């Protein structure tokens, strides 16, 4: 299963319902505090019910929603690549489609609502479902109620012992009058709990790697995988027998020492000696795992917390992925895994950033893996296809847009920086201007934009030349390349942005002609 999309409503900065679409590899970009991490944390809450990195609380309800009298927020996730069959009633196999549990796009959509204090309020499946009152609540009905419907309408059914077969018979009977419509089907009450239990088993495992962590070898995330590995190793039957033999040998030797001590004491104070006896724990009472409580990974005898921050983060990130695989394996259902990485470039040299994104791209190609990350790194974005990048913008009204190949005929870091991070730079201005020159479009373009007074510096005398009008973009271009000319006011950031936008629009117009 893959996350196809997610919807947030009344959650933190997301007041109006906002939909985010995902690919096998999705990179979310945008300004600081725009809500990128909120998307990852919403997924953590949805999948892990507060038992992952994020615990929902009363500050998660959107401020405007609270002021407006609303007291719930919702997180919805839409899944694609669904299993062909699913078990939701005892051991009987059925399909999500035949149970009318798919939305209008033939995908599985699950919505969870939370109260203002952050507690899970209800779980729904949003689906195109029968609304005919005679067959609209079959999923929540007990099997005895389903049999009554068979009886009341004289509906034939081959197997009255299996709920999903009874439901299918009833829906077939009303097939010409199902009145399908999109509705929220509650799956956390009545017999629908069985349905949710079956669906929950096939959901992907989601794990979140956050950026703000200390990355020490004493951290719980580092210690836990090794501690769990220690416990699993020590549970091995053969090893248990060896430990018991060791324990018995130690007990025997300790008893000799203790008995000799008591015998000596009898010669000094028999009364005290007679009430003393050695207390030596049994092998089963020994906490063998505690012997290995300080396990860690070192290199050249240097522990993680003495390494550089970049290396610490790489090691911890590797722990994180190994732990995610282990947790998924422990579920026993061979589920898909979704990795969420928050700003993986933190503390990493640009070379390491490129190595990381290459690794993420390879991971996302695995049949059962999906990768979602946030970034501020142009180096990472340069390694991606445009289809992998989505941009988050807007303040109170969030806007999600994809980044498309744009005005230049090659992938430009400066252009990506401008589109993704809204960062106008003189370098990008230079690229656009040079592109217009190379296409012999610069003359026509400069005649279409506003003109600005410019004083040229005489290259021989250094004296100012007469004032003349030139296009805004040429004015900025001259200031970039002739910075020693002090006779003109420096262009403003607003003018730089204006000029970039004008050149982009002109290039786009010429492309379409």
Predicted regions mapped to residue ranges:
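Switch/communication elements of ASCE P-loop NTPase nucleotide-binding domains
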Residues: 1-49, 53-55, 260, 289-418, ...
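Beta-strand elements of well-folded, non-transmembrane domains
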Residues: 26, 79-83, 114-118
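Conserved P-loop NTP-binding catalytic core
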Residues: 41-104
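Short glycine-/polar-rich loops that comprise or flank the Walker A/P-loop
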Residues: 70-75, 106-108, 118, 202-206, ...
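Switch/connector loops and helix/strand junctions flanking conserved nucleotide-binding motifs
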Residues: 83-89, 119-123, 217-220, 381-383, ...
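Electropositive, glycine-dotted interaction segments
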Residues: 91-231, 470, 475-478
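Extended helical coiled-coil dimerization/tether regions that scaffold
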Residues: 186-192, 198-207, 211-339, 471-475
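RecA-like P-loop NTPase motor core
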Residues: 361-367, 378-513
